[in-house]
Amino acid sequence: MIKLKFGVFFTVLLSSAYAHGTPQNITDLCAEYHNTQIYTLNDKIFSYTESLAGKREMAIITFKNGAIFQVEVPGSQHIDSQKKAIERMKDTLRIAYLTEAKVEKLCVWNNKTPHAIAAISMAN
């Protein structure tokens, strides 16, 4: 009887942990963060600008509709584990711009200007 109760409890615990596991899409991922919102774009990047100038180290992308987003270049304000992810995002955006890939959605932090990219979803 005790084994049965433990088995049921463990199964319920495991099921609920799995249900809240890895996000299945950008909307689920974005919902895990505060101060974020989803932008649905379905368009290619119109311009890509990269700045290494002092306090304005960032990559900036724009779209035809006028939307502007940024990715900060890793600096002293970032911990080591963030630096590689930021560099990968910057590289992804540069490649998307050069190959004219369509950006489906962006999850952005809306408490920065321009909005800072947290996640990207692209579609062919």
UniProtKB/Swiss-Prot annotation:
Disulfide bridge partners, by residue number: C30-C107
Sorted UniProt keywords: Disulfide bond, Enterotoxin, Host cell membrane, Host membrane, Membrane, Secreted, Signal, Toxin, Virulence
Record's GO cellular component terms: catalytic complex; extracellular region; host cell plasma membrane; membrane; periplasmic space
Predominant location: secreted
Compartments, record wording: Secreted; Host cell membrane
Single GO MF annotation: host cell surface binding
GO biological process: positive regulation of tyrosine phosphorylation of STAT protein
Coiled coil: none
Signal peptide segment: 1-21
Subunit and partners: The holotoxin (choleragen) consists of a pentameric ring of B subunits whose central pore is occupied by the A subunit. The A subunit contains two chains, A1 and A2, linked by a disulfide bridge.
Function of the protein: The B subunit pentameric ring directs the A subunit to its target by binding to the GM1 gangliosides present on the surface of the intestinal epithelial cells. It can bind five GM1 gangliosides. It has no toxic activity by itself.
Protein name per its UniProtKB record: Cholera enterotoxin subunit B
Organism per entry: Vibrio cholerae serotype O1 (strain ATCC 39315 / El Tor Inaba N16961)
